[in-house]
Regions:
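CoA-thioester-processing core
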Residues: 28, 50-52, 56, 63-83
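Hydrophobic alpha-helical segments that mediate membrane insertion or helix-helix packing
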Residues: 6, 54-55, 102
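Well-ordered beta-strand positions
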Residues: 38-41, 59-63, 79, 110-113
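Amphipathic alpha-helical segments at domain termini/boundaries
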Residues: 72-162
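Single conserved hydrophobic/aromatic residue that forms the stacking wall/gate
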Residues: 1-12
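Short, well-ordered alpha-helix to beta-strand connector turns
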Residues: 8, 58-59, 99, 108
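Thiamine diphosphate
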Residues: 13-38, 44-52, 56-59
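Hydrophobic alpha-helical bundle architecture
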Residues: 42-46, 64, 87-93
Length: 162
């Protein structure tokens, strides 16, 4: 049973490689790092795996209060470290996937508040909060020269995890 699960995980990774996902993510990061426009990223639900890495290049990274963001799922991390996805809660805790934790360690810049229970409880409030964040941060970022924005973006990318 364990052998088949590992084989299935290996096949999923191999299929991803066959489709060129890692190369596509790398190309995305290279292109986004040179875009001459402010980039604001808002994680509204689950930002995970290669998709999380692909959007990490923004000039400002915000997350909704109850969103999660990581380059691997807690199940994948637990499978790698403890060889069982059953340890996903421990992995999630160690990975710091929640917005408040990621803000503390400077992976993200801002936590956008949500109603108790999540964004689906009041779309109007959450939409207004996201709009306010976007307007505020676009105003701030538009004061930088393009050279300064590109320099800050590059520094942000190389400082992740440092």
């Amino acid at each position: 049973h364990l052998y088949h699960r590992r084989q299935r995980q290996m096949c999923i990774r191999d299929r991803g490689e066959q489709r060129g996902q890692s190369e596509a993510i790398a190309r995305n990061l290279a292109v986004m790092s040179e875009l001459k426009t402010p980039i604001i990223v808002v994680v509204t639900g689950e930002g995970g795996s290669g998709g999380a890495l692909a959007i990490s290049i923004g000039d400002h990274l915000s997350m909704l209060e109850y969103a999660t963001y990581s380059v691997a799922s807690p199940e994948a991390c637990a499978s790698i470290i403890w060889r069982t996805p059953d340890k996903a809660p421990e992995a999630a805790n160690a990975m710091k996937v929640c917005s408040s934790e990621l803000k503390k360690i400077n992976v993200i810049d801002e936590v956008i508040s949500e109603p108790v229970g999540g964004a689906h409880r009041d779309f109007d409030i959450v939409s207004a909060n996201i709009k306010a964040s976007l307007v505020n941060n676009l105003t701030i970022l538009s004061k930088y020269s393009m050279d300064d924005l590109l320099e800050r973006r590059y520094k942000r990318l190389i400082d992740i995890g440092a």
